[in-house]
């Protein structure tokens, strides 16, 4: 053996020994990261070949990122690994792993443009390696989506679908198609979403031979289909898809179902999973909560929220993934609205504070940035329901200014319109109704929200004593609400229509409207409609000289009033009530002493329709 060969063999032995030692220290209990890094650093003293040097720099970067806060040193090692590996042939794993990790590091330091540039270069170089090409396309599209650059994200996913098709990777192609449908859904490109879902659905049914992969894709497909219908406010239309989704998730969660690793570990082009099954399980609960709330089943929504939150806490104990915080915030946002409908506003403000805490706990305020507008909207609803109208107005205006989501903006504007109506600001009311009408004439918004728009116009007409016009708008609302089983919108419309008929002296029609309104309101349950309806019933029974029923209606009205007043006192004494004063920056922490000031508006409402204000209306979803 020559001296050169002996030296090379000796060096190889050193590399292997040092790598083995480094791995030993890394996997020790507890890990000894300092010694692990020292072993990897020692490799460089042997002036190793380029590929060994690049791999070692990558390993250093991985260890520093995973176990230390030394981001700068991690970046230097990864940049060194990239500069060495970029021109090397047949070295894809190190080259593209480095690019992927560098992009993650840039995101950690809030340098999204650097992350995109890095990945664009890697995508360009990876065209002959389908696995890495698709993986990097997914990563890059995710960053564009997070930055709300949806068209760019969509284009990249279309490229991924083509690449997967050329490679004969049908499972991967469907993943790209469904991911693109999700982006198009955010962009509200309704027709494009339908076309993609139909295309993906046919492939899932006919071209995915592996039954386990097929079921996973089916869950992804059904989640999107359910979200699509819910975004359009089609609560009745969505029921068959939701039922199918619930059955599919039960199949996947069954004890005899194989692990994700065994389903997706066989072929490199099938090692892509949208979400692991445990997270899918939470997501199905979430869309079920959304459906229950929109349909007006508050008890169901509460039950499923509690189950989902319990599941999230279990998963957090195993591994605290960032998506679990996203799920938790969205669930809390839903349940807050349910609490307010039921008159539990003190519980609602506590849960708004809990959502705030989840947002503040996520690094770089990334979750707060995404949900700040929703939090302002919820605080606006809370302020409105506790009669802090000035605070409510400011909260809704902040929400409108912060959000780019059309439905959320419409939702906030409709509630602003009700504030202007109740505070007799006719010019502001006209301006906002005209703006809402113009913005939504040529777009297909949620049926629930558009029904809400007609309801507000009916309420406006009622306050102007334009009873014929009020009936016209409310019948349109009822038509939309009944078509899709939007029970809360139906009950609100019926009780207002009853009040319209009462105002024009048609007690028979008024009774015909208020009776089903109260039945629905007790099922939901909606304390505001019950309060309003009981006042109407009291007047109707007084007019018909039915003393016994008049007494019952009055007793019910007093009961609902007292419940709301007691809850109001709790609200304004809660430390979390201070959130009504948050209008910019980070929301304040509210664990201090309770507040003691009571607003004038907390006085008991009179049990008479002549003095009764229209109840705060919240129209369906805004996610």
Curated annotation (Swiss-Prot):
InterPro entries: MAU2, TPR-like_helical_dom_sf. Keywords: Cell cycle, Cell division, Chromosome partition, Mitosis, Nucleus, Repeat, TPR repeat. It is found in: Nucleus, Nucleoplasm. TPR repeats lie at residues 96-129, 451-484, 491-524. Transmembrane segments: none annotated. One of its GO terms (cellular component) is nucleoplasm. One of its GO terms (biological process) is cell division. Pfam families: Cohesin_load. It comes from the Eukaryota. Interacts with Nipped-B to form the cohesin loading complex. Belongs to the SCC4/mau-2 family. Required for association of the cohesin complex with chromatin during interphase. Plays a role in sister chromatid cohesion and normal progression through prometaphase. This is MAU2 chromatid cohesion factor homolog.
